[in-house]
Amino acid sequence: MKAAETRILELRAELDQHNYRYHVLDEPSIPDAEYDRLFHELKALEAENPHLVTPDSPTQRVGSAALSAFTQVRHEMAMLSLGNAFEENDLREFDRRVTEGLDLPAGDLFGEGGKVQYSCEPKLDGLAVSLLYRDGALVRGATRGDGTTGEDISVNVRTVRNIPLKLQGKGWPELLEVRGEVFMSKAGFERLNASQLEVGGKTFANPRNAAAGSLRQLDSKITANRPLEFCCYGLGQTSAEIADTHIGVLETLKKWGMPVSRELKLADGVEECLAYYRDIGERRLSLTYEIDGVVFKVNNLAAQRELGFRAREPRWAIAHKFPAMEELTELLDVEFQVGRTGAVTPVARLKPVKVAGVMVANATLHNMDEVARLGLMIGDTVIIRRAGDVIPQVVQVVVERRPETAKPVEVPQSCPVCGSHVERTQLIKRSKGKETVTEGAVYRCVGRLACGAQLKQAIIHYVSRRAMDIEGLGDKTIEQLVDEKLIGSPADLYKLKYEQIIDLEGFAEISSNKLLKAIADSRQPTLARFIYALGIPDVGEETAKVLARSLASLDRVKQALPEVLTYLPDVGLEVAYEIHSFFEDEHNRNVIDALLGECGLQLQDQGELGAEFAASTTLEGLIDKLHIPSVGPGAAQKLADRFGTLEAVISADWLDMRQTLPEKQAKSVRDFFDDNANAERARAIEAQLKDFGMHWRSEKKTVEGLPLAGQTWVLTGSLERMSRDVAKEKLESLGAKVSGSVSAKTHTVVAGPGAGSKLTKANELGLTVLDEEALLKRLTELGVAVD
């Protein structure tokens, strides 16, 4: 596995955990600036390696899920977060993208000298909220949540004294959504912590935590007694426009009673933005509230609309974070930690030093490639950085201060936890018909679940909320279970007895019974949750959902060849090999067999192959996926058109091949299939595709003109005269696309006994619904045999 890929996986796992603690628990374990650095690093790595981007990456989404204790609210306009700038050049690059991305008359949006005008305001460190007004009255308050769905905190926002319950003045739209930040001033934070200490209550680490925890209290009386404030920074949905510029919007909102930052300013071009940023940075400590940067937005709203959005953020706004903080210290030692996948990761142990107000004694080193890049030796004087007050990392060695006693950093030959052998990972790639093996950046303990560190992390992942969701099994409890040898694999969780649990620290009768019930309740997971819980390298929550939705059975997932897996959305060859290798491993198979056998797990949602996946194969696509040297999609299409079947391509003689392709490509194809291993591999892929129920689609030109061309059909419930697979095949032979979900674009729904939500939705949408008899009649009318 490449260093970049390994680091991406580490960053995603860490960011997911921090997202959960920040957005769901309101108990962040790291500063926001540290999160920003991790996110920025992940984003940069993914930009350099776009093939490694997956739907489950934190860069593809905002935040985490809303708490179920509050009513969920769907935002009509997504509450997106902002991209970040850490250096002045980042802001200049943002300005360049804005300038080049605009296609409007210069007089409409540029200031003096043709420079884009930006609004400038401090980035408050609080909790983003949405305030919805109807006819001037506050009717709802909501948190951002995951950007799409938040929490209804209406009763709590009403207690924030500077949020108007009724807008002042007149002229406001019938519907107006105001967005802003609820925060706590430095003085208010100090008063709150002092009063909490007096009554023996919980104190807060910083004003942001205090604001978030106060605003999301289930008891609004508690919120009312907290010194919360609000500052608006923009709009969501409105029934009418209220200004042509962002600053105009905020000035209008201020007239209607909304609190707006006193530091709001207009800047002509990027250099004035930088001057504003430097000024605020110098005055940062004297401000009455915490800020972690400055937000710049294109002021002209028409320009904002022209620039639009990316997946996670607007193109017309950016948050310029405060700079890195660095200090010198001594590297005392390098220790090695073992993660869930067995990765043995170096960690720097430092002579404690205060960086940006925080005492730092440890720093990440990522992997041994990073140690080599830095030229790091134990005893060195090193520069530690906390970018934007961030997580500590070693950024440089001061070589001229290296002592004579400095020692090289060496990877342990045996695991520091279990004593098993440590080996360097190997990356196996198949390209142009050949397999190549290269060394990865990661070292791994081969002990697997016999290694206590790996076992603990594997169980923590297995029981997590997005996996098997077994409540009551916290990290400390899992450590006890492993340390006392009560569990040796996830399967052992289902063998735990009441007598074993009640003896654990922190457990009594009620909590023991609750845990046993939670474990028992996890015996019927969805296929997607189970796949995710297995902890397959590179398989996050979204990839697990894709596997479950497309292959629809664990057996197919286990058997799937890497080339077959690449037919799935967003599954590249490297990830496909990781999945295939995981299920090829005998130890992993034994654990899965135990879970599904003696432990009694019953996977839900297994059944027929996903309709879109089943119809996604073409002969030319298969040929292309073989990675024959010099043969791309165009040549693959010519081969499919000429020969019609894979076997005909494999057995084609030189003359036929030369009549189809240029000499170089023809020779490459013949040489490829003359290697018996390649020919057999191709046959195996085709056989598995057919065994799974996939089939070659005709080219679009052959579908046009068929009676059901352009129509989308959905099959739901059971059929008696023919299987759904057969019905699907017959409909597709008539040109129809058979989908697994109902939408407004669906033409006809065939509903048999047991049809559920799909039938309900079809009726709600007023779609044509046929029973089995009507389907058979329709097929017969179109000349398709039904017996």
UniProtKB/Swiss-Prot annotation:
Record-level GO BP terms: DNA repair; DNA replication
What catalytic reaction does the record list? NAD(+) + (deoxyribonucleotide)n-3'-hydroxyl + 5'-phospho-(deoxyribonucleotide)m = (deoxyribonucleotide)n+m + AMP + beta-nicotinamide D-nucleotide
The enzyme class is ligase
Instruction: Give the organism the record lists.
Output: Pseudomonas syringae pv. tomato (strain ATCC BAA-871 / DC3000)
Q: Where is the BRCT domain?
A: 703-787
Query: Gene name on record?
Result: ligA
EC annotation?
Answer: 6.5.1.2
Which family does the similarity line name? Belongs to the NAD-dependent DNA ligase family. LigA subfamily.
Record key words, sorted:
DNA damage, DNA repair, DNA replication, Ligase, Magnesium, Manganese, Metal-binding, NAD, Zinc
Identify which residues the record assigns to the active site. Answer: 123 (n6-amp-lysine intermediate)
Gene3D superfamilies the UniProt entry points to? 5' to 3' exonuclease, C-terminal subdomain (1.10.150.20), 6.20.10.30, BRCT domain (3.40.50.10190), DNA ligase/mRNA capping enzyme (3.30.470.30), Helix hairpin bin (1.10.287.610), Nucleic acid-binding proteins (2.40.50.140)
The record's annotation in PANTHER family points to: CHROMOSOME TRANSMISSION FIDELITY FACTOR 18 (PTHR23389), DNA LIGASE (PTHR23389:SF9)
InterPro entries, per database record:
BRCT_dom, BRCT_dom_sf, DisA/LigA_HHH, DNA_ligase, DNA_ligase_AS, DNA_ligase_CS, DNAligase_adenylation, DNAligase_N
Which residues are recorded as binding Zn(2+)?
415, 418, 445, 451
Its cellular-component GO annotations read:
cytosol
Q: Where does NAD(+) bind?
A: 32-36, 81-82, 121, 144, 181, 297, 321
Record-linked SMART domains? BRCT, HhH1, LIGANc
- PROSITE patterns listed in its UniProt record: BRCT, DNA_LIGASE_N1, DNA_LIGASE_N2
- Function in brief: DNA ligase that catalyzes the formation of phosphodiester linkages between 5'-phosphoryl and 3'-hydroxyl groups in double-stranded DNA using NAD as a coenzyme and as the energy source for the reaction. It is essential for DNA replication and repair of damaged DNA.
Name-wise, this protein is: DNA ligase
